[in-house]
Amino acid sequence: QKMKVFKIAIPIIIIISILSVDYYNKYYKDNTDFENESIYLYVIKDDSLGFTDSISKYFKSTKTFYKVAEKLGYLNNKKTGRFKIDKGVGNNEIVRSLKFNNTPVNVTFNNQERIENLASRVSKQILEDSLSLIKAFRNEDFLKENGLNDKNVLSIFIPNSYNVYWNTTSDDFRDKMLTEYNKFWNQVRSKKAENMGLSKLEVISLASIVQIESRKIDERPK
């Protein structure tokens, strides 16, 4: 009787072992294929072809990734964004990162002479294109609500580096820049501008002109 049970148990144990190894390999075995400690995947929700091209560069097996991603309900719920993937992780962790690890970018710009130049500079660093950004920057309701116009709106964009999500909208980016502008003008800076007989926008505008002219001088042939 014991021998009969043993003969039945052995194949079951073997099958369970094979299934366990297969499960581990699919979900937890390292599926990354890059040298750096981490990479960033730029995902656009409805761009399936672009997504496949991206993961094929960085994953050892796209086949197992897609199987796990489907099981975990990711493929029908892709999110647009910039996602950090660490080296040495399996498909389970990769999918988790693609769900929850949208990582900001550092958007940097210096003084620009025209709103079009600024939009072009920013559009190279986030998903939105320059036309969408220009439209948001020149939105009539936005300008009216904040006492701005088409000529002075450029002054609210203070040259610096800013943490924003790669998939931020043009309106959200513009509103963040206005918030940063208002933060910049604390009580001390506001008082200094007042003492000089200048408005906040005039101070920023003058500083921008000085920097641009200085840059032009530096760029002249020696």
What are these regions (language model features)?
Residues 3-222:
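Conserved catalytic or metal-liganding residues and their short signature motifs at active sites
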